[in-house]
Amino acid sequence: MSDNFAAVGIALVVAIAINLIMMLMPKLLAPKKPVPEKLTPYEGGNQTIGRTWLGFKSNYFLYALVFTAFDVETVFLFPWALSFRQLGTFAFIEMFVFIVILLVGFWYAWKEGALEWM
């Protein structure tokens, strides 16, 4: 049994080492000759007009969060629907409670205005 853990440990160490090597190689091998032209933001070859760094609206984050919640619901709902007949009444009640919890969350997000575009 300890052989299995040793194999997992070795695989973990190798995976971490490969990631570290891949992250450090560009820093070690890339040329380091910063010139003012390279440090300017690129906008299709045109000079920038106004501020280059603009704020990011948090509404997009809220949309992504709500989308992720309902996407996860779909991931859980699909296998349940495929094996609905074998699972019985308990699984139906469990999935009903799951959907009710998600609908309450959706209602709360709607009530708080998280789903308004602007």
UniProtKB/Swiss-Prot annotation:
Please list the GO terms describing molecular function.
Answer: NADH dehydrogenase (ubiquinone) activity; NADH:ubiquinone reductase (non-electrogenic) activity; quinone binding
Name of the protein: NADH-quinone oxidoreductase subunit A
Ranges that cross the membrane:
5-25, 61-81, 90-110
This chain's function reads: NDH-1 shuttles electrons from NADH, via FMN and iron-sulfur (Fe-S) centers, to quinones in the respiratory chain. The immediate electron acceptor for the enzyme in this species is believed to be a menaquinone. Couples the redox reaction to proton translocation (for every two electrons transferred, four hydrogen ions are translocated across the cytoplasmic membrane), and thus conserves the redox energy in a proton gradient.
Question: By its UniProt entry, which Pfam families does this protein fall under?
Answer: Oxidored_q4
- EC code(s) of this entry: 7.1.1.-
The annotated subunit structure for this chain is:
NDH-1 is composed of 14 different subunits. Subunits NuoA, H, J, K, L, M, N constitute the membrane sector of the complex.
Cell location: Cell membrane
Recorded catalytic activity of this chain's protein: a quinone + NADH + 5 H(+)(in) = a quinol + NAD(+) + 4 H(+)(out)
How is this protein positioned relative to the membrane?
Answer: Multi-pass membrane protein
Taxonomic superkingdom? Bacteria
| Entry keywords, A to Z | Cell membrane, Membrane, NAD, Quinone, Translocase, Transmembrane, Transmembrane helix, Transport
Q: What is its main location?
A: membrane
Name a GO CC annotation attached to this entry. plasma membrane
The text of the family note is: Belongs to the complex I subunit 3 family.
